[in-house]
UniProtKB/Swiss-Prot annotation:
This is Temporin-CDYe. Residues 1-22 form the signal peptide. It is found in: Secreted. Residues 23-42 form a propeptide. Pfam families: FSAP_sig_propep. Keywords: Amphibian defense peptide, Antibiotic, Antimicrobial, Cleavage on pair of basic residues, Secreted, Signal. GO terms for cellular component: extracellular region. GO terms for biological process: defense response to Gram-positive bacterium; negative regulation of nitric-oxide synthase activity. It comes from the Eukaryota. Belongs to the frog skin active peptide (FSAP) family. Temporin subfamily. Expressed by the skin glands. The keyword Nucleotide-binding does not apply.
Length: 59
C-alpha cells in the first residue's frame, strides 16, 4: 500500500511540474504575440498539494 501511495505522489508531483512548464511556455508565447505586453497572474498550487499529501499519508 505504501508503494502505491509513493507512486501516486510521484505522478502528482511530475504532473504538477509538467503543467507548470507548459503554462510558462504558453505565457511566453502569448507575450511574444502581444508585443512584449506582460500579464501578471498569480498561481497557487501549494494548497491543493498539501491537502492531497495529507489525504495520502493521513488515511
Amino acid at each position: 500500500m505504501f508503494t502505491l501511495k509513493k507512486s501516486m505522489l510521484l505522478l502528482l508531483f511530475l504532473g504538477t511540474i509538467s503543467l507548470t512548464l507548459c503554462e510558462e511556455e504558453r505565457d511566453a508565447n502569448e507575450e511574444e504575440e502581444n508585443g512584449g505586453e506582460v500579464k501578471v497572474e498569480e498561481k497557487r498550487f501549494i494548497g491543493p498539494i498539501i491537502s492531497a499529501l495529507a489525504s495520502l499519508f493521513g488515511g
